Amino acid sequence: MKIAFFDSGIGGLSVLHHAMRVLPKEQFVFYADEDNVPYGVKTTDEVKGFVQQAFDFLVGCDVKAIVVACNTATSVAVREMRHRYDIPIIGMEPAAKKALDLDGEHRVLVAATPITVHGKKMQILIDRFDKDHLVDLLPLPRLVEFAEREEFRSEAVHAYLDQELGRFHLADYSALVLGCTHFNYFKDTMREIMPENMHFVDGNEGTVRELIRQLDARHELEDLPQTVDYYYSGRRVEDPAELARIARYLKRLDFVYDIR
């Protein structure tokens, strides 16, 4: 049986990319809801409806687990999906706790989509772990749009990030938490703007580690040739141009993977 990765668009490829490195004997399904991206500026009810449609499709594919490789979908819908479907469902959370644990003295900046930044789940997370009030939140909605059109290194991207990150005195911060899977594509540009003392933290490693833990507990880890099937909003991706597009995103992730 295969492992499904679900995202509003191509951001979730960053989580799949890490899983492909550490689970070379597994077979995967990647579902990008390209018809409805971006989720971060939609209403909560709209996102819940999109997620349920995707889950109905993926469960029909007889997958053994679903990784919600989307912070927005996790914050809005993952609890409800766990009640609805009887398979392991692993969500993404902004790794604010991890960032605080790494330092504990300097400030932490969490970048995410507006719906994640302003959501109840984020507030609960901050209330639980940010006892010293060291966390600041930064919505970056345009990064999702830039990523979806493969615009990673343009003057517009640099100007946008320079403006938004420039709202903060970054020398006071130890970490930038990438609270949206689309944001990993921009690590090189962000690195140019950030001071040396500031590093990246994302939830990809922890999410895949939790996936492995749950599958191991169920004795469902495989020893098969690695494959990936790609779907856009329920339609299998077979067009060579679209497969080449996905390959370009994965190549981009190879390039930024080791940027800290």
Regions found by a protein language model. Name each.
Residues 1-260:
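Non-catalytic structural scaffold of enzyme domains
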